[in-house]
Amino acid sequence: MPFIPHTEEDVSAMLGAIGAASIEDLFDEIPPALKTGKLKDVPDGLPEMAVARLMQERASQDGFWSNFIGAGVYEHHIPAAIWQITTRGEFYSAYTPYQAEASQGTLQLIYEYQTMMTRLTGLDVSNASLYDGASALAEAVLMAVRSHKSSRRVLVPKTVHPVYRSVVVTTVRNQGIDLVELEYDPATGKTVLPSEPGAFAGLVIPQPNFFGVLEDVHTMTDWTHANGGLAIALVNPTTLAVLEAPGKWGTKGADIAVGEGQPLGAPMASGGPYFGFMCCRQDFVRQMPGRIVGRTVDLDGKPGFALTLQAREQHIRRSKATSNICTNQGLVVTAATQYMALLGPQGLAKVAAASHANTVALAEKLGAIPGVARAFASPCFHEVVLKLDDGTLKGTSAKDVLRALRAQGILGGLDISGWYPELGQAILVCVTETKTGADLDHYAQHLERILSKRREAPPCAYKN
C-alpha cells in the first residue's frame, strides 16, 4: 500500500517480535471462504497524477451549464476566502463540542453568527441553527403551538414551498396539529386571508413566496395578531439586506423568523449540507429549539461564552425537550458567518439588488417572446413564474421546453405544473447576481427559437 511509512525492514522486525512469518499470518484465523482475494473486475490502482487526469477528463464531460433554477437553492458567488477559512482545522467540525465551554473559539463564532442573524431579522434571539429551511419551518410550527397553548391550528399558505409544506405535514402528522391551507389570488400570486379564520396558533408568512412574489407582509402580520395568532416569517436571508426585517413587519413585528441559510455562502451540492436559521422574540426563547450560545464572565471577571438555557434541549430533559434536534450545522454556519462578515451590509445589499435587477431584465426579455407570459402581475425578488401555454403552443409542455433548453447547456428553470396544475404549463425561473447581460440574452434567444420550432411543428425536437 502506498503512503505507509514502514520500510520492509520495519515490517520484518515487527512480525518477528510477534512471531509471525508474514502479514497474511495475521489474518489466518479468517476462513478462506470469507476472504475476497484479488477482485478480477477491479482494475489495478493508478498513480496520483493519472487519477487526477482521469477525474479532470470525467469532469470536463459535464460541460458548462447556465443555471436559472432556484426554488430554495440559489447560485450565488462565494468568495474564495469563505471556505478557505471555514476548512481550517480550528473550525472544521459539524458540531457544537460536547465539552462546549472548552472550545471558546467555536462558541464565539456561533455567538457572532447569532448576533448577525438577529440584526438581519430584527428579532431578539437566534439559535445556533437547525438542519435546513424545511425542518426550521416545521420546528417553528411546533414552537407556535407550544407558545400559543389555546389552539393547535396553523395556517399555511399554498404559496409556501411544496417541499417545505410536505416536511411540515410529516413532522406534525401524529401530534394533533391541524394544518389549514390558504389559497392564493390567481391574478397576483399573493396569499388570500380568510374573512373568518377561527382560532389559530400561527400563520406562516413567506417572503418572498415560492412564486417569487412579494407578499403584503405588514397586512398579514397585523391580521395575524388581530386574530390572536403568532406570525411566523419564512424568509430568504438575501432579501433581508434590502427588504423590511421580519421584526419590523406590521405594528408589532413577526414573532418567529425561519428560513434556509444556503444563500449565505453554501454551495449548491446535491441538496446539502445546508442549514436552517431561526430567530424569535425574547418572549418565546424558552420554546425555541436548538442550541443557544450566550456571553458571560468567568470567576475572574473575564468574558467568555457558554451554552445557555440548556434545559430546553433533548440531552437535558428528553421528555420535555422543545425538539428532537439536539445539534446544529456548525460547519455551514461557520461559512455563513464568514460570508456575512466579509460582505457586510453593503455587500449583501449589492447581491440582493443585482439579483433583483437581473430577474426584472430577464422577465422583460422572456415576456416579449410570443407564447410566454408572466403568471402574476406582482413585484418579485429574484424568481418569477412564466406560463408557456397561450393557445399557440398546443402539445408543448414545460418539461419539453426545459429539456430542449438543457440540450443547449441552459438549465432554464423548474417545472411547477405538477405542484400547481391550475397554472398550466409553467416554469419557475431564478436569476442571481452571477448572471451577465450576455447570459440573459443567450437564454432569451434560445427560448424564442425553441418555441418558434414548437409552433411550426410541435412533435419535432429542437436540435440547434
UniProtKB/Swiss-Prot annotation:
<dbReference type="InterPro" id="IPR023010">
    <property type="entry name" value="GcvPA"/>
</dbReference>
<dbReference type="GO" id="GO:0019464">
    <property type="term" value="P:glycine decarboxylation via glycine cleavage system"/>
</dbReference>
<dbReference type="InterPro" id="IPR015422">
    <property type="entry name" value="PyrdxlP-dep_Trfase_small"/>
</dbReference>
<dbReference type="InterPro" id="IPR015421">
    <property type="entry name" value="PyrdxlP-dep_Trfase_major"/>
</dbReference>
<dbReference type="InterPro" id="IPR049315">
    <property type="entry name" value="GDC-P_N"/>
</dbReference>
<keyword id="KW-0560">Oxidoreductase</keyword>
<dbReference type="GO" id="GO:0004375">
    <property type="term" value="F:glycine dehydrogenase (decarboxylating) activity"/>
</dbReference>
<comment type="function">
    <text>The glycine cleavage system catalyzes the degradation of glycine. The P protein binds the alpha-amino group of glycine through its pyridoxal phosphate cofactor; CO(2) is released and the remaining methylamine moiety is then transferred to the lipoamide cofactor of the H protein.</text>
</comment>
<dbReference type="InterPro" id="IPR015424">
    <property type="entry name" value="PyrdxlP-dep_Trfase"/>
</dbReference>
<protein>
    <recommendedName>
        <fullName>Probable glycine dehydrogenase (decarboxylating) subunit 1</fullName>
        <ecNumber>1.4.4.2</ecNumber>
    </recommendedName>
</protein>
<comment type="similarity">
    <text>Belongs to the GcvP family. N-terminal subunit subfamily.</text>
</comment>
<dbReference type="InterPro" id="IPR020581">
    <property type="entry name" value="GDC_P"/>
</dbReference>
<dbReference type="Pfam" id="PF02347">
    <property type="entry name" value="GDC-P"/>
</dbReference>
<comment type="subunit">
    <text>The glycine cleavage system is composed of four proteins: P, T, L and H. In this organism, the P 'protein' is a heterodimer of two subunits.</text>
</comment>
<dbReference type="GO" id="GO:0009116">
    <property type="term" value="P:nucleoside metabolic process"/>
</dbReference>
